[in-house]
Structure formats: C-alpha cells, structure tokens
Amino acid sequence: MEISWGRAMWRNFLGQSPDWYKLALLVFLIVNPFIFLANPFIAGWLLVAEFIFTLAMALKCYPLLPGGLLAIEAVIIGMTSAAHVREEVAANLEVLLLLMFMVAGIYFMKQLLLFIFTRLLLSIRSKMVLSLAFCVAAAFLSAFLDALTVVAVVISVAVGFYGIYHRVASSRGEENDMLDDSHIDPHYKTVLEQFRGFLRSLMMHAGVGTALGGVMTMVGEPQNLIIAKAAGWHFGDFFLRMSPVTVPVLVCGLLTCMLVEKMRWFGYGETLPEKVRDVLQQFDDQSRKKRTRQDKIKLIVQAVIGVWLVTALALHLAEVGLIGLSVIILATALTGVTDEHAIGKAFTESLPFTALLTVFFSIVAVIIDQHLFAPIIQFVLQASEHAQLTLFYLFNGLLSSISDNVFVGTIYINEAKAAMENGAISLKQFELLTVAINTGTNLPSVATPNGQAAFLFLLTSALAPLIRLSYGRMVWMALPYTIVLTLIGLLCVEFTLAPATEWMTQAGWLATLS
C-alpha cells in the first residue's frame, strides 16, 4: 500500500536524517521568528547556536541543508538582508576562490602526493616519529600554504591509503564501494578498524600541525593577512612579532604530539597493522614495476608544479585561488587530462563546502547586523592595558571556537585599531594587542571544527565517514592540543610577549607602525 502524501513529504524532507533531527530543525524554524520579534539580540545568538548544532550533527545531515534553511529564514524575517549577505560573500571572495580552485588543483597532484607519502609511511616504522613527521610537515606547509590546502593534501593521501586496503579486504577490485563493509571478512574488519584508528590519529596530528604553522606567518591563515595589513607589517615583521608566542607553542605542540602517541591517550597510539603495511608495500612495488616513462614524466611535472605552487604562494604572486586555477590548467595540460568529466571530478570535494561557507557568511551578516559581539568588545576595552592582552586572547579564542576565524579576527583588529586612532590605547599597546588577537584567533580555535575551517573541511569530507571521524571524536582527540596550545599561548601573552617585543625593538629587528 502506498504511503500518504504527508508521510511521503516527511520522508523527502532531509532524506535519511533521523526523525528527531528533522523535528528539531522544524522547531528552530518555527520559534525563530517569534523570538526575533520579542528580542532580536537573543534571537541572533540562538541562530548562531542552532547553526553550530547543524555543524555538530554533520554526519546526520550535511550542514548545507539545515544551515541553509536557517539562513534563508534569517534573511526573510529581517535578521539580515540579502544585500549584506552579498557584501560578506564579496568580501570573502578570496576564500571561496581558494576552495573552488586550490582544492581542485591539489586533486591533479594526488599521484605525486600518494607516491611521496606512501614512501614516507613505509620507510618510517615508528608511529611516534611518523606522527611527528606528519605534524611538522603540515606545520611547515601551512606556514606558506593555506591550511585548507594542506588538509586537502593529507585527506587525498588518507583516502588513497584507505582505498588500497579496502579494495583488497573486500575483494571487489575497482568496483569497490569504500562505504560498504558488508563484503568484508570479520578478520579483515578487525584490521580495518585498527587502520581507521591509525588514519584518524594521523589526520588529527596533521590538522593541528596546520594550526601550529598557520599562526606563525601572514600567509598562513586568511585572517593573518587582514591583521598584518591593519598593523602595517610585512612578512618578516609578522613572523618576528608573533614568535614570542608562536615558537614556544610550536615546541609544546610537537611535544604533545609525541606524548599522546607514547601514552596512547585520547584515541591516539594506534599503529599501522602489518597486514595493511604488506598490502601498501605490494601496491607500491606493483606501481613501480608498472610505471611507464609517461607515468614518470607525469610525476616530474607534478613535482615542478608543486614547486611553482609553493613559490607563488610564498611570494604572493597572485591571489591564492588564482594560483590554484593555474595549477589546474598546468597539471591538466601537461599530464593529458582533457576530458570534461575527468576535470569535473576534481571539484566534487570542494564545491559542497564552498556552498556551506557561503551559507556561513549569511550567519556572519546576522552577527554584524544584530551587534552580537558589541558587549564583549566594550567590556574588553574598559579593562587595564595588561588585562586587555589576556582578555583579547581569551575572548578571541572563545569566539573563534564557535565562529568564523576571519570574522572574529577582522572584528577585533578593527576595534583595536579604532581604539588606537581615537587615543584610547597607545601604539605600543595596539601592536601587542595585534599579537594577542592573532594568536587568540588561531590557537584555542582547534577546540572544535567550528573554529578551524580546515577541521570543518575534514569533518565534512568524504574521508570522515570512512575512518569514523565524528564531531565528538574530533573534539575529544583535539582536547590535549586545545589545553596545551591555549595555556602555553596564554602564558606567553602574559609573560614573554611584552619583554621579548621590547628587546627585539631595541635591537632594531622590528619596524613600528607609521
């Protein structure tokens, strides 16, 4: 017997999502207009909380759908306007271009990356050393590349590793569905679970590595560029001014990496199963035997394009997204990828997230229009100069863990600069606050995927369900890093920032804002 019209509509609404999730979203959509009529400020914070809820439930339903419905309603009831959303999207066009083109560009370098990381994985047997290598590599790369790019690289490598073993375990060859474990023998499933734990830990080490490296340079994170521009700092100035905080944090972050692996805390410590190592070794041996001269040329071309990518980003020869587009053009033209459908596959990973980020900008527009952060900013600027550093750091960290880093960093640096121009704070205090704002925006935000775009990208990627990386598990595995990075950063802002900056200024290493 065919189901009723109402039941059919309910099943279609958000598809396979649980009924309780669908009901919760309907409740949000119904109550928001009434709360907005009663108190717009409370309604604004409620909308932010609801959006965070959709991100937390990313594995129940991709956040673009529920988050998009909330954003559309916010515009309709007047919490913000379509024109303001367009302004926010236009202001963040660089980030959208990055997602569309840079992530797709990395897709065409996967052969080289898989080759390099397979050699790395097979040559380093110690899990602690391997984890440290992944963390250091991610930190170094993210100091020059955007963190999203680095995470995209590691995701592509992890999916490659997982796919190789899953095909063998399921005995289904190229037609294998990596999400389907029904054809896998129980013995293989045990090994597969261990392999998933191994990949989860590597992904988290690499993800935190991007935060450790990204905070150090003005090109490491999008908000760093905005902060550096407001302060009038160039690449060297930015690195030196951040170093009293970022260098100790980097050292302690790497020590944390080794400690959690050694002690097997927080879900870390899982080693690469020997059966998987054997499969990867066989795959590597077969790949080398089958590799033709044409294949070798492709690897060489991809390596040259990789050099171009790092050089262009480090020297800022063009916007990040446009450099990514050049990578797509060069990689496809020089490796013979000419079919439209083959090129289109490169965009399947990044475009859903690009759409999600666009929805997020509409939530940012609500935050601005409803002045949700205004009371916090006023409170901080009323404190003493020494307390301001700590408060800016902590409030940046708190807000960055639930909101967009670029937005939080932009709001605070603009407020700090306005305070300096109005005579509320001195130039020296502004320069110290700039460091507190940048480190506060970048370091504590590793606490949740909401705070780090790279973490959110990982959570919503095709890899997350394969290795069973949920929102809660990601927060739990990030916890030791969150504690160490936040506390060491806070201690450095409190005790080493001012004296170290004073010493570097007297030594003539630092230029001041003119």
Swiss-Prot record:
InterPro entries: Na+/H+_antiporter_NhaB. One of its GO terms (cellular component) is plasma membrane. Pfam families: NhaB. It is a multi-pass membrane protein. Keywords: Antiport, Cell inner membrane, Cell membrane, Ion transport, Membrane, Sodium, Sodium transport, Transmembrane, Transmembrane helix, Transport. Na(+)/H(+) antiporter that extrudes sodium in exchange for external protons. HAMAP family: NhaB (MF_01599). Belongs to the NhaB Na(+)/H(+) (TC 2.A.34) antiporter family. NCBIfam families: NhaB, PRK09547.1. This is Na(+)/H(+) antiporter NhaB. It comes from Salmonella gallinarum (strain 287/91 / NCTC 13346). The lineage of its organism: Bacteria, Pseudomonadati, Pseudomonadota, Gammaproteobacteria, Enterobacterales. The gene is nhaB.
